[in-house]
Amino acid sequence: MRCNAVRTGTLRRQIGTWQGIAEGGGLSAPHVSWPGLNEYDSHAVIAAIHHEPLPKPDTPELYRHHFRLLRDGLAAWMAGRVQPAGMPSYVDFRAGVIGALDHVRQNFENEVLLVSSGGPIATAVAHVLDAPFEASIELNLRIRNTAVTEYAFNPKRHQLITYNTLPHLDAPPYRDWLTHARG
């Protein structure tokens, strides 16, 4: 893998992921933190529609309940029916993600690595495909941890090349490493 520039969200886990990629791949591209790549707060999204405390989801039934609430909360946030505490509006969240894509198109010609999280990745994919916001909910809940989504871009637009791939974990010894939300 090679890249000429790196943008990550400002979250510790996103920066840590970049540091691991850089160390493992021997990369030294310039890195800039980009707040528009930050993840939404799933707890705040759920709390916006379900005000009582929830038990830790540690059974199949509680996992299903958690992801039903998350889907409903995301749909309400995206439609502007709720405003989760401490979060931007969905319009602003989406604008931050699109701003990162626009920044890449306007400032680079090739190989830019964006290190983010499921919500921004799904939002970017839905935007590039001109899909309705509801599609980003399902895209988000299918993203596998450490998955790669690849775009081609020119000064006018991005094009989706791959979504949710794990080329770095394709070998048999890594099969047990695959994880994702079971929503």
Feature map (PLM): residue ranges:
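Acidic, low-complexity terminal tails and accessory targeting/binding regions
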Residues: L27, V32, Y40-L62, V91, ...
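Generic structural signal for well-ordered alpha-helical scaffold segments
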Residues: R94, I98-R105
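Phosphate-coordination/substrate-recognition cap region in phosphate-metabolizing enzymes
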Residues: M1-R71
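GST superfamily/GST-like fold recognition
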Residues: G118-A122, N154
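Beta-strand elements within well-structured catalytic alpha/beta cores of enzymes
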Residues: R7, N110-S116
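Surface-exposed cleft-lining segments at the edges of enzyme active sites
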Residues: M78-R94
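Conserved nucleotide-sugar donor-interacting segment of glycosyltransferase catalytic cores
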Residues: H103-F108, S117
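Active-site signature of alpha/beta-hydrolase-fold catalytic machinery across serine-
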Residues: G20, T123-H127
